[in-house]
Amino acid sequence: MIEKLDFKADIQTVLNDFDTIVKMSPWDDDHQIGLTHRPNATNLWKDSVGSLYTNGKSSGVSENEFTELNAQIPETLKTLLLDFAQSQNIKLGRVRIMRALSKRGLTVHRDTSVRYHLVLKTNIDSFFGFRDLKQTNGVAAHCYHMPADGHFYKVDTTKFHFIYNGGKTERIHLVICPR
């Protein structure tokens, strides 16, 4: 369900670009910063944040609509994203920086396609979990930890999944939705 890819980034360079982005678009209550947006969007940093579904119902917006990279993204990060997309033979859809604060998580859900993750900051008590529908021997979920090792990870988020940050520090991932 989680595949470590050969494609690797210089994590310190990405973190430097991340710091630049947070200065332009500080965190708010949704704990997401969008790096792509729809054509003619008015708030380029926030257009792609949040869920495209509410109570299981589509908002009418598709991942395929997020076709524009924010022009204010540092060039090194922009190049990394485009090189990564080319290496995976995908087109970039929604690209977001997503943060989970200490002792916080996301509810069980599933997405319409796989996601690619680059871990920027994490801790050993931060997990990505997948529901086990069989619940063999009472096991209801399988949890994984993705390290901040510079590798991109392909995650099959079409399966029911959740994240939980049980650590004392924030967890930050760059998340790419292909289109």
Label for each model-derived stretch:
Residues 116-122, 152-154, 168-179:
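A short hydrophobic beta-strand segment most commonly corresponding to one strand
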Residues 99, 110-126:
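Short, conserved beta-strand element in jelly-roll/cupin
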Residues 106-109, 126-128, 153-167:
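Short beta-strand His + acidic residue motifs that chelate non-heme Fe in jelly-roll/DSBH
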Residues 121-148:
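A short beta-strand-loop-beta hairpin characteristic of the jelly-roll/cupin
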Residues 82-102:
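A short glycine-rich, His/Asp/Glu-containing loop-to-beta-strand
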Residues 1-84:
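Non-heme Fe(II)/2-oxoglutarate
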Residues 110, 120, 130-132, 165, ...:
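Residue-level recognition of conserved beta-strand positions in structured domain cores
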Residues 2-4, 113-115, 171:
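Intrinsic-disorder/low-complexity, polar/charged segments enriched in Ser/Thr/Lys/Arg/Asp/Glu/Gln
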